[in-house]
Swiss-Prot record:
Biological source species: Stutzerimonas stutzeri (strain A1501) (Pseudomonas stutzeri)
Chain residues that bind ATP: 334
Complexes and interactors: Homodimer.
Stated name of the protein: Methionine--tRNA ligase
Catalysis: reaction(s): tRNA(Met) + L-methionine + ATP = L-methionyl-tRNA(Met) + AMP + diphosphate
Residue ranges of the motif 'HIGH' region: 14-24
The entry's keywords: Aminoacyl-tRNA synthetase, ATP-binding, Cytoplasm, Ligase, Metal-binding, Nucleotide-binding, Protein biosynthesis, RNA-binding, tRNA-binding, Zinc
One of the record's GO molecular function terms: metal ion binding
Residues given in the record as Zn(2+) binding sites: 145, 148, 158, 161
tRNA-binding domain boundaries: 577-679
Signal peptide residue numbers: none
Family: Belongs to the class-I aminoacyl-tRNA synthetase family. MetG type 1 subfamily.
Length: 679
């Protein structure tokens, strides 16, 4: 047997400013399954995480609730911990970035970077809220767009016309926090010299640590030239003060990944057999894996390895990136009841249903995963209840009734048993490669073979034939052994089902190596149902409860939906003014990200006999722009072209919604054709 590996695994830190939802759970379930597989194989695999507990958002929410930030993050951590535990996510340690360990490590890494010449300082001019006494990030500044005069726009981007600009260009700026008129003020900021590590990053990102598509994306940033990274924020700020710099704080993304190290260090204090340096020193032979979403790859594949390199620590073995979660083919929606909190799900359904469904769809890539609720019900009921559990329920009764619960020593179908044995290495390889979907397909193919064999032998019919009872016992003994095999293969995904099966099988906790053995002359415990089918009514109840979550979280609204109160009707215009706007149907032929733009997508539009290029500020609502391709939309064709730093924008597309994730691109009814005029 090969020597046990030493592995440290992390998931991205959940922000301590709200509840966990099913989109978050995708990552933690994915990570937990991989960790459980490693432990099942006998490796030393340690899984740590923490709440990301710093930043202005937490400070402001705590102020709004009339509590301290410390009280807020303690309350949220208790909620997060309960949700994770009930979803069977088994951290070895779940800590907080607001901890003595994280402060100590953040200061250590910063001072090492500073002393090595990797920190720069310079003056930055920013808007300052004189009423709150704080500098304002772009998202905390609102005003009138300098391009289209739309009101209530953010400090760097107009969500109506798609323009990007500097906060100082915004007309009638105001603080989104206090409503006060901000003033420009200079402040000393601290920058991490990321370009110092460009050569190292080019080599590391192409060295096998990243999925190919992620490495390709990072290469775009590297080829475009790296910029120094602003790592400081001014007081008031909830976080750690920079050593020797009163009133200056580490930006939340500086100390957040250090939280991985801090959580592990905290665990080391409670488990003296663990050594911090054995996992984090530059000479470490241990493996280090980060599981993250595709929205934060720049922090984990550029800033983080550069910080570690500059401070004399080891870099990650690999960073595993996953896509976003959609529900029923669309973004999670509060109004549709598909923005489902972890606790709302747990109030209605077994967590292992979702663990299995996620596993069945999680491959090696970074594609988005769709939770189709009809498919979810069908797959769980068919695979887990109809295939896996069905084998045990078919066979257990005959063994109890015919042989007092004792499995006979028999293998009446050596070829089938050998097929299960032969599949084990491939299933293990799929788990190791984090290709859970392939592992589930191979496991269910085995379950199909076992069920087909039992159906062909029909022990229920043989049991009625005199003299066939011994054959029935042999068939059912092998059936239970095949069930035991499937339980071993599924144990990383379904730990509760495995524990219940171990109780029925009357065995100690199963390890991966147990798949090579047959139970013989072995007494079983009484069989009880191991998993029940999903009732569609429970899905409906969960959706309704999610809508109620939304209603409960919103203050009472006036009659109607309140949209006119948010955006009053504009001044009346005559028909000629309206007719001057040339609205056309446009086919989106291509939709893509704009490098360097936080909120823009580049759309190539077919308007019948011509194509147009448009930049639109809808990125936040459409994280996978390729899904817009082939869709019809409404296009303002005679708007004067506008030169932007990313290129020329030739008109604009129409969308509704308040902004952020709630932007809804308008589409015509069926039958409309590109180029047709909208009247």
């Amino acid at each position: 047997m090969s020597e046990a590996r030493q592995i440290l695994v992390t998931s991205a830190l959940p922000y301590a400013n709200g509840s966990i939802h099913l989109g978050h759970m995708l990552e933690y379930i994915q990570t937990d399954m991989w960790v459980r597989f490693q432990k099942l194989r006998g490796n030393q695999c340690i899984y740590v995480c923490a709440d990301d507990a710093h930043g202005s958002a937490i400070m402001l929410r705590a102020e709004k609730e009339g509590i301290t930030p410390e009280q807020l993050i303690a309350n949220v951590q208790a909620e997060h911990s309960a949700d994770f535990a009930d979803f069977l996510v088994n951290f070895d340690n779940f800590h907080s970035t607001h901890s003595p360990e994280n402060r100590e490590l953040a200061e250590l890494i910063y001072t090492r970077l500073r002393d090595a010449g990797h920190i720069a300082t310079r003056s930055v001019t920013q808007y300052f809220d004189p009423e709150k006494g704080m500098f304002l990030a772009d998202r905390f500044i609102k005003g009138t767009c300098p391009r289209c005069a739309a009101e209530d726009q953010y400090g760097d981007n107009c969500e109506k016309c798609g323009a990007t600009y500097e906060p100082t260009e915004l007309k009638d700026p105001r603080s989104a926090i206090s409503g006060a008129t901000p003033v420009l003020k200079d402040s000393k900021h601290f920058f991490f010299k990321l370009p110092d590590f460009e050569a190292m990053l080019k080599e590391w990102t192409r060295g096998g640590a990243l999925q190919e598509s992620v490495a390709n994306k990072i290469a775009e940033w590297l080829d475009g030239g790296l910029q120094e990274w602003d790592i400081s924020r001014d007081a008031p700020y909830f976080g750690f003060e920079i050593p020797g710099e009163p009133g200056k704080y580490f930006y939340v993304w500086l100390d957040a990944p250090i939280g991985y190290m801090a959580s592990f260090q905290n665990l080391c204090k409670r488990r003296p057999e663990l050594s911090f340096d054995a996992f984090w020193s530059k000479e470490s032979s241990a493996e280090l894996y980060h599981f993250i979403g595709k929205d934060i790859i720049n922090f984990h594949t550029l800033f983080w390895p550069a910080m570690l390199e500059g401070a004399g620590f080891r870099k990650p073995t690999a960073v595993n990136v996953h896509g976003y979660l959609t529900v029923n083919g669309q973004k999670m929606s509060k109004s549709r009841g598909t923005f489902i909190k972890a606790r709302t799900y747990l109030d209605h359904l077994n967590p292992e249903y979702l663990r299995y469904y996620y596993a069945s769809k999680l491959g090696r890539g970074v594609d988005d995963l769709d939770l189709n609720l009809d498919d979810f019900v069908q797959k769980v009921n068919s695979d887990l209840v109809g295939k896996v559990v069905n084998i045990a329920s078919r066979c257990a009764g005959f063994i109890h009734k015919g042989n007092d619960g004792v499995m006979v020593e028999a293998n009446p179908e050596p070829e089938l048993w050998a097929a299960f044995q032969a599949a084990a290495p491939s299933i293990a390889d799929a788990y190791e490669a984090r290709d859970f979907a392939r592992a589930m397909r191979e496991i269910m193919a085995l379950a199909d073979r076992a069920n087909a064999w039992i159906a062909d032998k029909a022990p229920w019919a043989l049991n009625k034939v005199e003299g066939k009872q011994a054959e029935v016992q042999e068939i059912c003994a092998l059936g239970v052994n095949l069930f035991r095999q499937l339980v071993i293969f599924l144990k990383p995904v379904l730990p509760n089902l495995a524990a219940a099966a171990e109780q029925f099988l009357n065995v100690a906790p199963l390890s991966w190596d147990d798949h090579a053995t047959l139970l013989a002359n072995h007494k079983l415990n009484a069989f009880t149902p191991l998993m029940t089918r999903i009732e569609p009514a429970k899905i409906d109840a969960m959706i309704e409860a999610s809508k109620e979550d939304l209603a409960a979280s919103e203050a009472a609204v006036p009659a109607g939906n309140g949209e006119l109160a948010k955006a009053p009707l504009a001044a009346e215009i005559n028909f000629d003014t309206f007719a001057a706007v040339d609205l056309r149907i446009a086919l989106i032929e291509k939709a893509e990200f704009v490098e360097g733009a936080d909120k823009l997508l580049r759309l190539t539009l077919n308007i019948g006999d011509a194509t147009r290029n448009v930049f639109s500020g809808i990125k936040s609502a459409y994280p996978d722009p390729s899904k817009l391709e082939g869709r019809l939309t409404l296009y303002v064709a005679n708007l004067a072209p506008r030169k932007m730093k990313f290129g020329m924008s030739e008109g604009m597309v129409l969308a509704a919604g308040p902004g952020g994730s709630e932007i809804y691109l308008l589409s015509p009814d069926n039958g409309a054709k590109p180029g047709q005029r909208v009247m």
